A protein has these predicted regions:
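N-terminal capping/lid subdomain adjacent to the active-site entrance of alpha/beta enzymes
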Residues: 1-160, 277-325
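Solvent-exposed, charged interface segments at domain starts and junctions
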Residues: 6-15, 180-191, 196-212
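Conserved beta-strand termini and adjacent loop/short-helix elements that scaffold enzyme active sites
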Residues: 21, 86, 190, 238, ...
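Shared catalytic-loop signature of beta/alpha-barrel
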Residues: 64-65, 197-298
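Glycine-enriched alpha-helix->loop->beta-strand junction motifs that scaffold or abut catalytic
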Residues: 102-105, 132-134, 156-164, 180-187, ...
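Catalytic beta/alpha-barrel core
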Residues: 106-117, 137-144, 161-173, 185-195, ...
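Active-site-adjacent beta->alpha loops and helix N-cap segments on the catalytic face
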Residues: 113-128, 146-150, 169-181, 196-198, ...
C-alpha cells in the first residue's frame, strides 16, 4: 500500500466503488446501508462508518478497510463460525418468521427501541423462545437505552425466557457495573468498546462479563485481536451491518480467536435487501464458512452510487489517522 493510497483515497491506484443497500427493517434510525469498497492486492475491503461518525472515529474504519485490501488477515484456527440470528424490533409474528428462516440455535433480540412499549419487548422475546425451542439460546440487546432501574426490571422480566446474556443494557460503564451487580444474567459490553483502551476500562470497572468486538470500529482484525487479548474476557464477534465484504472481516476475526465460546453476531446479511457479491455470507445450519469474498460486478452495479462523497469521507478519515499516528 502506498502512502498516497493511505493518505489520499481519491488519488490512489486501488479500485474504489460505493454502494447503497436497503434494509429490510429500520436499524439505528436508517433504512439504507451505504459504504465504500476498496480493492487491493489482498482482496476487497469495506469502509462503512455510520453517518454520525466524524473523521477521527471513522479513521479506525478506514484502517480496517486498508488491512483487508492490502494486508489480508491472520491464518484461521477454525473453518466455520457459529452465529446468531438477529431479530429487530418487530412484532411477534415477524420475529417467529425471522428465527425460523435463520437456521440458528441462538437468537439476539433487539429491545428498548425508542417509541415502543416495554410489553412489545416481552411479546417479542416470548415469540422467539417459542420459535427457537427450549434448547435454543436467547440474548437481548438494548443498545444502552435503559437507565439502571429500568434495566434491572426488564432483565428480570425477560429472564423468565432464560436469557443467555443481556447486551449493553445501559449506556455508561458505571451503569453497566451497577446493573451487573443487581441481576443474575451475564452482561455484555458493546457500545462501551470502540477504542483499544476501552476493554481495560471495562475490566477495571467490573462492568461486564463478556465483550462484543466489531472489526471496523476497532481498526481491523489484528487490532481487534490485540483488544481481545488485553481484555481477558470472553468475546463475541459482531457486525456493523455490513455487506458480505465487511462481514468477511468479522468472520476472519472470529476464526483467529484462540477461543470462541459464544455464537457470533455475524448473520446480518438477512437484514439487507441485496449484496455486492454473488454468494453472500449467509448461515447454513447456524454456521458461516470462513472464506474471502469476491465482489460481483453485476451485483455491485445494481446498488452502486456516486463514490465522490465516500471518497471525501475516506480522505478525512485518512487525514485524521495520520494526525493521530
Amino acid at each position: 500500500m502506498t502512502a498516497e493510497e493511505r493518505l489520499d483515497p481519491e488519488r490512489g491506484s486501488a479500485e474504489r466503488r460505493a454502494f447503497a443497500i436497503g434494509l429490510r427493517n429500520r436499524f439505528r434510525g436508517i433504512t439504507v446501508r451505504e459504504g465504500l469498497l476498496v480493492r487491493g492486492p489482498a482482496g476487497w475491503g469495506e469502509f462503512s462508518p455510520f453517518a454520525e461518525y466524524g473523521p477521527r472515529e471513522s479513521s479506525r474504519w478506514w484502517a480496517a478497510c486498508l488491512e483487508a485490501a492490502h494486508q489480508g488477515w491472520p491464518e484461521p484456527l477454525r473453518e466455520r463460525i457459529p452465529v446468531n440470528v438477529t431479530v429487530p424490533a418487530v412484532g411477534p409474528e415477524r420475529a417467529t418468521e425471522i428465527v425460523a428462516s435463520g437456521g440458528c440455535a441462538t437468537a439476539k433480540v433487539k429491545v428498548a427501541e425508542k417509541g415502543r412499549d416495554w410489553r412489545e419487548d416481552v411479546d417479542r422475546v416470548e415469540a422467539v423462545r417459542a420459535a427457537i425451542g427450549p434448547e435454543g439460546r436467547i440474548r437481548v440487546d438494548a443498545n444502552g437505552a435503559w437507565d439502571v432501574d429500568t434495566a434491572v426490571r426488564m432483565i428480570r422480566e425477560l429472564d423468565r425466557f432464560d436469557l443467555e446474556y443481556v447486551e449493553q443494557p445501559s449506556a455508561t460503564l458505571e451503569e453497566l457495573g451497577e446493573v451487573r451487580r443487581r441481576v443474575d444474567v451475564p452482561v455484555a459490553a458493546d457500545e462501551s468498546i470502540r477504542r483499544a483502551e476501552d476493554p481495560l476500562r471495562v475490566r477495571a470497572a467490573e462492568a461486564a462479563d463478556i465483550v462484543v468486538l466489531k472489526v471496523q470500529p476497532l481498526g481491523g482484525v489484528r487490532a481487534a485481536l490485540r483488544v481481545a487479548e488485553a481484555c481477558g474476557l470472553p468475546v463475541v464477534v459482531s457486525s456493523a451491518v455490513e455487506s458480505s465484504v465487511g462481514l468477511a472481516a468479522g468472520v476472519a476475526l472470529a476464526a483467529a480467536l484462540p477461543e470462541l465460546p459464544y455464537a457470533c453476531g455475524l448473520a446480518t446479511m438477512q437484514m439487507l435487501t441485496a449484496d455486492v457479491v454473488a454468494e453472500p455470507l449467509t448461515p447454513v445450519d447456524g454456521y458461516l464458512p470462513v472464506r474471502r469474498v469476491e465482489v460481483d460486478e453485476r451485483s455491485l452495479e445494481a446498488v452502486e452510487i456516486d463514490a465522490a462523497p465516500w471518497l471525501a469521507r475516506a480522505a478525512a478519515a485518512a487525514a485524521a489517522e495520520a494526525a493521530n499516528a
